[in-house]
Amino acid sequence: MKKDDRLKKFKYKVAAFYNFISIIDEEILLIKEELTKLATNQKIKGTILLASEGVNGTICGPENAIVQFIETLEKLLKVSDINVKYSWSEKQAFRRFKARKKKEIVTIGLKEINPTKSVGKYIKAGEWNQFLEDPNSVVIDTRNEYEIKIGNFAGALNPQTSSFREFPAWVQKHLKPLIEENPSLKIGMYCTGGIRCEKATSYLIEEGFSDVHHLEGGILKYLEDVSSENSLWNGECFVFDQRVSLDHELLPGSHRMCHACGLPISPEDLKKPTYIKGLQCDACVNKFTDSDRARFAERQRQIDEIMKRLPENSIWPSS
């Protein structure tokens, strides 16, 4: 089925955005209040994080409402170029709207890192293949292990982290020795939408690394700009909402989420004897107590009842 035909059933637009920009506390409170009011009026759901270093969020709603929301956010931030990527969803991708004030909009846990002052060099999506194939470059995936497992660029280093907080330790243990032995290597990093790899470049620059680059707009921008025929991307892209993953056309992929452990599960995982809907998957079969599983079973029973009564429910069902 062609993308245009598939899009006919996708009535919700999803916007993933971020901007590293200095914001004072009074402005944060105002922005939070205005965006919450707009989201309520326009039936927009999602999550937005606000901090002194900027804004980071993903929202879902009717297309016109999403456009208005982004325009309002840019006015509130006094910018005209917020980093935003769009994709589509058949159903509402979030359960509620939340706007929160945080210490960081993406948590690396180091106070001295300030992406509003210094970051690496952007690589456009159309130039990323050339960088990947450059023998004098090293490419690093700054996402978590469970994200990398379902999709990646072949040859990229996998730090095998379970959270972004672990990235600095990996740099000290693995990347520093590599660059000390190969000082001419160019460093390139990527992530889902650009925010983690951008902050990672700020950290590397602070640590004295040079020739540091990152994929502008992340994987999502690459999938938007680079055709599947020319793409070096393998698999699907994990996203932090009810869709779980996106295919190369930025439409919902084939993965579901295990609502016991929160990890993505593939169509093959669903067929394994260890999989029980809502209770366990192959990755967490030995991780929970009988008491935990009883709670999971009751939650799944309630979800199933809701789905029976409200078959047109816009929220994705549990897996």
UniProtKB/Swiss-Prot annotation:
The active site is at C191. Its EC number is 1.14.-.-. SUPFAM superfamilies: Rhodanese/Cell cycle control phosphatase. One of its GO terms (biological process) is tRNA modification. One of its GO terms (molecular function) is oxidoreductase activity, acting on paired donors, with incorporation or reduction of molecular oxygen. Pfam families: Rhodanese, UPF0176_N. Residues 133-231 form the Rhodanese domain. SMART domains: RHOD. Coiled coil: none annotated. Belongs to the TrhO family. This is tRNA uridine(34) hydroxylase. It comes from Prochlorococcus marinus (strain NATL2A). The gene is trhO.
